[in-house]
Amino acid sequence: MYKFEIDAAAPKSELYAELVRSADALTSGEPDPIANMANIAALLWEYLPDVNWTGFYRVVDSELVLGPFQGKAACIRIPFGKGVCGTAAQTGETQLVEDVQAFPGHIACDANSASELVVPVMRDGTVIAVIDLDSPSLNRFNAEDAEGIETLAAAISGRI
């Protein structure tokens, strides 16, 4: 059993540093990537304010396949280059979207989502998954959130 003391009201830099430490503790010694993604998705869901979906899409062949998540049921498969997640997977670059309605080709898995942050998880220079965060609020995510999730993605890349 894991118990974490994470102050969701702390400055974002502190919050993300603690999330990375907690994710490390949760995944340390566990070889199963699905179990590790499930715990990380739950950790993000519990401690990130104002989110309505947290989770992973895994790279399988040339598309993204739904992985462990928290939130409403989601799209199961996303082709590379389609929507925010597919764009992140294809480019290998973080996608910070303040208003999903303004994103060309946005895939609306949850009509309540207004903003989105998608960060590629890289291993040996190749995208192996993406971390997807959705919020019902416009402009929920900023560069500090992107940096925090990018740090998390780098920290867990060998465990998922």
Language model feature labels by segment:
Residues 1-68, 155-160:
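Intrinsically disordered, low-complexity terminal regulatory regions
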Residues 53, 118, 130:
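Short hydrophobic/aromatic beta-strand element in the GNAT-like acyltransferase core
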Residues 59-109:
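Regulatory sensory and allosteric helical modules in signal-transduction proteins
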Residues 115-122:
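A short, aliphatic-rich beta-strand micro-motif
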Residues 122-135:
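Sensory-domain boundary capping and coupling elements
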